Curated annotation (Swiss-Prot):
Residues 185-338 are annotated as: Necessary for mRNA decay activation. Residues 93-113, 273-338 are annotated as: Disordered. The gene is ZFP36L1. GO terms for biological process: 3'-UTR-mediated mRNA destabilization; apoptotic process; cell population proliferation; cellular response to cAMP; cellular response to epidermal growth factor stimulus; cellular response to fibroblast growth factor stimulus; cellular response to glucocorticoid stimulus; cellular response to hypoxia. This is mRNA decay activator protein ZFP36L1. The lineage of its organism: Eukaryota, Metazoa, Chordata, Craniata, Vertebrata.
Length: 338
């Protein structure tokens, strides 16, 4: 058994070392011959070169260890990560190593403060640009963007231009070269100043609608919102076309009926018109609109006020205050004390 293992190892080593040369004639025992025949599967019948892709090409040391372990019945040593990578034919170390370092081509636009702030000269002259959508200049007025300038941009004269008559910055200079630039800058400032400001009449629910904004503007522009409306009489209101017709409305009253209804309570003569009382200023109204009494004279004033109110409702006398009369409850208390 030992002789068989040693002979198999020797023949395997000689096969690895003599690979690429012509087939050699080995004098070996039957077991070695069987191993050689099993290894040379696919080799031509006559003596010739063996097929190069029929045998793997590992290192000789690893192949010896694997062969000895397989003959002794031991498990084969595990392949390291490096050996497994190189044994894999589909692995490309250079490509895999360079793959993470490659940058993906960015499809976004270049972030520049002057992007699309000037018109593309070839596009304006020829109607076409070789850069297409990737061009950094504006292809038309609709793509032109406004450039954010410094507050002092074009506010002072360019010393270089007005000294030697030439400026290396040209139209991109931040100072004024001629009167046209000054006028253009002034026009741009006027446009920004004339921009309408936001209204401050925003509700909590959000921005007002167009109809509400138009109504508010109409109210502000109308002169009736500044001056009070004129005082109308009852006759004007009754004769207004906006009121319903008296013949069809059962709750409509004529001026004479209104006078007869309100005359007893208002102290008006029976034949008078209620328009003189309903639509006259408050300064000429009865004392029912007087200020409340002071705390010192509250009892007497309350008594007089109540008495005047009762008398006005009864229609017996005019609505005047009577300080001599008291409430019935206070009269009873004074009698019981006596």
């Amino acid at each position: 058994m030992t002789t068989t293992l040693v002979s198999a190892t020797i023949f395997d080593l000689s096969e690895v070392l003599c690979k690429g040369n012509k087939m050699l004639n080995y004098s070996a025992p039957s077991a070695g011959g069987c191993l050689l025949d099993r290894k040379a599967v696919g080799t031509p019948a006559g003596g010739g070169f063996p097929r190069r892709h029929s045998v793997t090409l590992p290192s000789s040391k690893f192949h010896q260890n694997q062969l000895l372990s397989s003959l002794k019945g031991e498990p084969a040593p595990a392949l390291s990560s490096r050996d497994s990578r190189f044994r894999d034919r589909s692995f490309s170390e250079g490509g895999e190593r360079l793959l993470p370092t490659q940058k993906q081509p960015g499809g976004g636009q270049v972030n520049s403060s002057r992007y699309k702030t000037e018109l593309c000269r070839p596009f304006e002259e020829n109607g076409a640009c070789k850069y297409g959508d990737k061009c950094q200049f504006a292809h038309g007025i609709h793509e032109l963007r406004s450039l954010t300038r410094h507050p002092k941009y074009k506010t002072e004269l360019c010393r270089t231009f007005h000294t030697i008559g030439f400026c290396p910055y040209g139209p991109r200079c931040h100072f004024i070269h001629n009167a046209e630039e000054r006028r253009a800058l002034a026009g741009a400032r006027d446009l920004s100043a004339d921009r309408p400001r936001l209204q401050h009449s925003f509700s909590f629910a959000g921005f007002p609608s167009a109809a509400a904004t138009a109504a508010a503007t109409g109210l502000l522009d109308s002169p009736t919102s500044i001056t009070p409306p004129p005082i109308l009489s009852a006759d004007d209101l009754l004769g207004s076309p906006t009121l319903p017709d008296g013949t069809n409305n059962p709750f409509a009253f004529s001026s004479q009926e209104l006078a007869s209804l309100f005359a007893p309570s208002m102290g008006l003569p029976g034949g008078g018109s209620p328009t003189t009382f309903l639509f006259r200023p408050m300064s000429e109204s009865p004392h029912m609109f007087d200020s409340p009494p002071s705390p010192q004279d509250s009892l007497s004033d309350q008594e007089g006020y109540l008495s005047s109110s009762s008398s006005s409702h009864s229609g017996s006398d005019s609505p005047t205050l009577d300080n001599s009369r008291r409430l019935p409850i206070f009269s009873r208390l004074s009698i019981s004390d006596d």
